[in-house]
């Protein structure tokens, strides 16, 4: 693994500031009118397909691998027609075969179909994105407590723009192929429930083309900011997950903070998704305490996500294996931004052991970090650079991180996606195969969510 290690070392040196930030927190062709389809163009040049039942021709689909000496060296593909009805893929057909000649048909232009990508850790409710460029000077030695104080001053300035900028962020995500997300949303005394209400209003408007879970996030400390009553109100108001934050370094009482977080989840039958940045032994202790809590509480099985979990980078291989085995049994997941600084997260080791590993943007141009791109294909590319030897099969496998484990081909090179009755949620990519898409972060040309074209265009 010398190639991978040297690449990781290089990225580590060039990416230290990215991890420090994480510790705190194509042009599209104009649409053509289809003869049989009902189309119109939105102001942002996104074509709108209003037909509930149609054919999409000239779709490039992966069909298998070609092997040399037992190693995949090339991905086989074929152009096919995909029949879509009521948000589902109902059939894969020979290209341009239309059994029902009365149905509208569109043309994907030979672009590669890949599963929709998923941004499973983002903050849609607080961002500079969509407004004027802005970066903040954060001196060396700035602590998370300093950032909390800064945020308490800034949140009232950001709130008037919450809905407008959340809409812009969703546009950005869709342009990168993402239609499924999980957003953390500030719940603390400064914001109250305003951010939640604003985000829910945006998601209600965008629900036809964008699915998003909401984590009620006590950004200023669950205990420190005395946010438990607000968190309970957020659960009653429809938040899907109970959030948490650094129970030792912020709240100063690890067990009490985690017990409070879990109790809220149990009282309202919700999941848990906690920000855990701590890299001291307290971070390892918090992870072990959470795993033990889930082991003792069957109602929490499959309901815990640990975001960031930087403390895992301080464990040796055997310790990670032992913890991963317990996490698999309890269906505990990890959400990581794939940090590239001095901390080398054991993401591949966790994934290989069967732990569900997800990724996300985290911040997109805000007071925590200016670097977020909103591109899950870029995250898969970064994962590949850090963790694998770059061959055809390994590159194609790395796509799992972007798509929530949905891949066109299985390990044997057999097609497993798309198939009949799958959601018609996918992205068209200007690439010859998923390996190329990961390696080159290939341009996206159209994004579909449950049969609806939500970004980009196809031809008629």
Curated annotation (Swiss-Prot):
- GO molecular function annotation: hydrolase activity, acting on carbon-nitrogen (but not peptide) bonds, in cyclic amidines
Q: Which UniProt keywords are given for this protein, alphabetically ordered?
A: Signal
Q: Which PROSITE patterns match?
A: TAT
- State the signal peptide span: 1-33
**PTM remark:** Exported by the Tat system. The position of the signal peptide cleavage has not been experimentally proven. Can also be exported by the Sec system.
Report whether Hydrolase shows up as a keyword of the record.
no
Q: Name one Pfam family in it.
A: Amidohydro_3
Q: Does the keyword Signal apply?
A: yes
The record's comment on protein family reads:
Belongs to the metallo-dependent hydrolases superfamily.
Q: Which named protein is this? A: Uncharacterized protein YahJ
């Amino acid at each position: 693994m010398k190639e991978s290690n040297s690449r990781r070392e290089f990225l580590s040196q060039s990416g230290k500031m990215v991890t420090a930030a994480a510790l705190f927190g194509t042009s599209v062709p104009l649409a053509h009118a289809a003869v049989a389809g009902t189309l119109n163009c939105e102001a942002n040049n996104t074509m709108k397909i209003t037909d509930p039942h149609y054919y999409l021709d000239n779709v490039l689909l992966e069909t298998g691998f070609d092997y040399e000496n037992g190693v995949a060296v090339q991905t086989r593909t074929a152009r096919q027609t995909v029949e879509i009805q009521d948000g589902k893929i109902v059939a894969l057909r020979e290209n341009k075969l239309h059994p029902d000649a009365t149905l509208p048909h569109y043309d994907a232009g030979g672009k590669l179909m890949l599963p929709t990508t998923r941004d499973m850790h983002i903050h849609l409710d607080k961002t500079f994105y969509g407004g004027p460029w802005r970066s903040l000077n954060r001196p060396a030695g700035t602590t998370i407590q300093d950032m909390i104080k800064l945020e308490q001053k800034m949140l009232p300035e950001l709130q008037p723009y919450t809905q407008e900028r959340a809409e812009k962020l969703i546009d950005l995500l869709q342009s990168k192929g993402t239609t499924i997300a999980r957003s953390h949303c500030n719940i603390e005394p400064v914001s109250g429930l305003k951010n939640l209400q604003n985000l829910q209003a945006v998601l209600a408007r965008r629900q036809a083309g964008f699915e998003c879970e909401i984590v009620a996030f006590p950004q200023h400390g669950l205990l420190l900011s005395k946010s438990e009553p607000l968190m309970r109100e957020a659960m009653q108001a429809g938040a899907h997950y109970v959030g948490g934050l650094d129970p030792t370094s912020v709240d100063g009482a690890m067990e009490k903070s985690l017990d409070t977080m879990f109790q809220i989840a149990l009282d309202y039958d919700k999941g848990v998704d906690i920000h855990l940045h701590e890299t001291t032994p307290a971070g390892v202790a918090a992870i072990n305490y959470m795993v033990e809590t889930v082991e003792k509480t069957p109602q929490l099985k499959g309901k815990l996500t640990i975001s960031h979990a930087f403390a895992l980078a301080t464990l040796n291989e055997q310790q990670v294996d032992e913890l991963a085995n317990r996490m698999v049994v309890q269906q505990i997941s990890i959400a990581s931004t794939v940090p590239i600084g001095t901390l080398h997260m054991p993401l591949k080791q966790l994934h290989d052991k069967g732990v569900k590993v997800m990724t996300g943007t985290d911040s997109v141009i805000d007071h925590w970090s200016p670097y977020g791109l909103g591109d899950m294909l870029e995250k898969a590319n970064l994962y590949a650079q850090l963790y694998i030897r770059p061959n055809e099969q390994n590159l194609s496998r790395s796509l799992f991180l972007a798509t929530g484990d949905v891949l066109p081909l299985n390990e044997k090179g057999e097609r497993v996606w798309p198939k009949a009755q799958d959601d018609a949620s996918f992205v068209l990519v200007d690439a010859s195969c998923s390996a190329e898409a990961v390696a080159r972060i290939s341009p996206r040309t159209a994004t579909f969510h449950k049969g609806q074209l939500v970004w980009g265009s196809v031809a008629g």
